[in-house]
């Protein structure tokens, strides 16, 4: 091949290379656009038939029907979930601060979905630690209006959860979301919400919890059975101290408060609540009679969920 032919051959190769590269990137761009359009269609399908996230009653499902004697003393209660709803100002600041520090330390900064939190959680897990990536708002959605899907480990469920969490943050304040969360989440031993949990484990109101008591309860929703202080006190103590560590790290408590609370042993004062759906404190036969009378007029769920006081 002569010099002139070689030059023509090289020029041809030089001209073909940009065409090949351009075609490749053009194909990738078209494929990306097609994939994006397809995903939009898929996600749109996933977001069909969403529950009504504007109804606050859906986040605070059932409360008990209570039977009182003529003096106003409680003698029995019927419930499907042991829950007593309280306002945020009736909950100890230790519970509020501990929940944010432990479950979602960027709660006041994100809009329901926290990409920074996801990246941090991924790094912690890669380095051998353990940290969740779901925000408090996502957890509220998962445990209430999407409770039927909470064990569905799919991308579809996660997309629905994130979408609802973002929409909730658009219509509710951070305080309202936190209040709904603390009244809805499960703390073990049949206790739903922080007020019921405070009564079950310590026989006191959530407003009266000490720092050590609050930290113990804050640690329970992550794994109520594993951290159950009546069964696994060592695990419960470790979890409580982890909550205290995070409260210190986020500036909610001082070093002195942290050290004093960690030095306290776990001291429970369990209530008489049975967790079975019927708590009878006096006159058991009469309570059975009243329940039978109610059953003639209403079904079990109406009796157990209505949050009614019956004075006899």
How would you describe each model-predicted region?
Residues 9, 13, 17, 21, ...:
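Structural motif marking the loop-to-transmembrane transition
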Residues 77-78, 256:
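Short capping micro-motif at the N-terminus of alpha-helices
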Residues 69-76:
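Juxtamembrane extramembrane loops of integral membrane proteins
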Residues 128, 132-310:
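Non-catalytic, structured segments within soluble enzyme domains
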Residues 60-63, 70, 81-83, 91-96, ...:
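Extracytoplasmic
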Residues 3, 24-37, 85-124:
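Conserved catalytic or metal-liganding residues and their short signature motifs at active sites
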Residues 1-67, 106:
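N-terminal type II signal-anchor transmembrane helix
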Residues 68-69, 169:
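Core beta-strand residues in small-molecule sensory/regulatory alpha/beta domains
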